[in-house]
């Protein structure tokens, strides 16, 4: 296979645990869309994928171990799922995936570049091993940073042996990468300050949204809103109800607004390990203005977002610089103001300020959150203006084409670097950053 003019195609391999036909959203869906776009739009690339035969949330019939997905060769490994309840089991499963991926890489033809994600956290070990054996460069796609997240959530002690061991390896993988991509400026800053990584080696590539699938429409036209009898000013949270989302803040704001602003309601549509605790608090505090609903299937997600007058997103301060909520672009595409309970330095805070598309609230300040909600509920013009700005931000800054173009530039620049060339200069030969990512 050649790239035209007799030049061979660049061979690229992505390593990630979950991939097409995974339909649970999040990072697996993003990476599947990215690979599909690159393969369709760039015939000079030959893209392979090494993944598992598992689905993140289900354990039904597993896909075939080998599949040609319209030109993308997918090799699926028969390994245990890494999303186990036990930390020890997750670690062992992740190491098993990394070992199997390493063996698969060494048995495959040579690649010009390897792309490796952070699921499972041990996946970069496979890319690092291939670099050591064959001098193949790799780009490290950091969506979630471990062990930092586990330490932030209290699952690991910062000074414990497991965390220190994992951090030592993380340091090696980051510094061994030809380039590292992150989802936001806050993550870039964390890698610079906590891992000593040179800023010039980090590329900010945001996750994207489908602005053609999520279209603005008035809340009153939402079937979800009609089915559930939602009236007045609806603040919607749609997503995982877990420990990292700090939904206690929204309950505190609901308690403050329950009597003074009866037209305001808070809708939490989702599931997760904190749902029962949140439901208990709603009942115990008699928060009649809070409605807990089940998550919706993917095809109903745009209609769910349309049910809101304002959207809500949050992230624990303990995860500042370690992750960026993947739903943010979707909320912007729905043309609703976004109320973000996030630290001041987070990527969401930067975008909201730059695009004037919502309100940033300090975590742990329910009074501030209640004030922001009341202000939006009483100012229809402000809501419409922020919603229009949100839609423009989604269309200009959070598109698949924009992010895929960054990845394509990254791939072509790194794959053409002779083994060891970047180490000699300490800088990559070129750096392409789309507008709006800095």
Specify the residue positions occupied by each region the protein language model found.
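N-terminal subdomain of nucleotide-sugar transferases
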Residues: 1-70, 419, 429-438
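Carbohydrate-associated surface elements
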Residues: 53, 186, 208
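A short helix/loop element that forms part of the nucleotide-sugar donor recognition site in Leloir-type
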Residues: 62-67, 215-228, 425
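Membrane-proximal helix-turn-helix segments that form the acceptor-binding/catalytic region
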Residues: 125, 129-133, 160-182
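Conserved donor-binding/catalytic core segment of Leloir-type glycosyltransferases
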Residues: 227-245, 251-254
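Nucleotide-sugar-dependent
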Residues: 245, 290, 297-306, 311-332, ...
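Nucleotide-activated donor-binding/catalytic signature segment of Leloir-type glycosyltransferases, i.e.
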Residues: 270, 275-302
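A short, well-ordered alpha-helix in the C-terminal region of glycosyltransferases
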Residues: 368, 375, 382-397, 406
């Amino acid at each position: 296979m050649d790239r035209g003019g007799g030049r061979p195609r660049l061979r690229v391999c992505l390593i990630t645990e979950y991939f097409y036909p995974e339909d649970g959203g999040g990072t697996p869906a993003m990476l599947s869309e990215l690979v599909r776009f690159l393969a369709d739009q760039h015939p000079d690339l030959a893209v392979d994928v090494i993944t598992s035969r598992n689905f993140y949330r289900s354990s039904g019939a597993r896909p075939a171990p080998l599949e040609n997905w319209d030109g993308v060769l997918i090799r699926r490994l028969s390994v245990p799922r890494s999303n186990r309840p036990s930390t020890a089991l997750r670690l062992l499963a992740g190491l098993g995936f990394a070992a199997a991926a390493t063996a698969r890489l060494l048995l495959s033809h040579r690649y010009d570049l390897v792309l490796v994600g952070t699921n499972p956290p041990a996946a970069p070990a496979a890319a690092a091993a291939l670099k050591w054996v064959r001098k193949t460069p790799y780009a490290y796609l950091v969506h979630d940073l471990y062990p930092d997240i586990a330490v932030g959530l209290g699952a690991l002690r910062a000074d414990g042996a497991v965390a220190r061991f994992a951090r030592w390896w993380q340091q090696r993988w980051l510094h061994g990468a030809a380039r590292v991509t992150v989802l936001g400026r806050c993550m870039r800053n964390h890698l610079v300050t906590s891992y000593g990584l040179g800023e010039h080696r980090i590329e900010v590539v945001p996750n994207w949204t489908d602005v053609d699938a999520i279209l603005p429409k008035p809340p009153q036209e939402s079937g979800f809103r009609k089915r559930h009898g939602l009236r007045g000013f609806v603040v919607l949270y749609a997503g995982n109800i877990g420990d990292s989302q700090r939904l206690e803040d929204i309950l505190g704001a609901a308690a403050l607004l329950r009597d003074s602003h009866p037209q305001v309601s808070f809708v939490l549509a989702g599931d997760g390990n904190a749902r029962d605790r949140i439901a208990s608090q709603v009942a115990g505090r008699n928060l009649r203005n809070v409605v807990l609903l089940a998550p919706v299937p993917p095809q109903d997600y745009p209609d769910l977002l349309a049910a809101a007058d304002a959207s809500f997103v949050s992230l624990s301060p303990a995860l500042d610089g370690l992750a960026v909520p993947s739903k943010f672009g979707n909320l912007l595409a729905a043309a609703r103001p976004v109320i973000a309970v996030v630290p001041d330095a987070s990527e969401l805070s930067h975008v909201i300020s730059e695009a004037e598309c919502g309100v940033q609230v300090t975590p742990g300040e329910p009074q501030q959150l209640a004030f922001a909600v009341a202000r939006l509920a009483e100012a229809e013009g402000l809501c419409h203006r922020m919603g229009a700005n949100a839609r423009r931000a989604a269309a200009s800054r959070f598109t698949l084409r924009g992010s895929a173009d960054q990845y394509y530039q990254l791939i072509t620049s790194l794959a053409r670097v002779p083994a060891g060339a970047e180490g000699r200069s300490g800088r990559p030969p070129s750096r392409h950053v789309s507008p709006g990512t800095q």
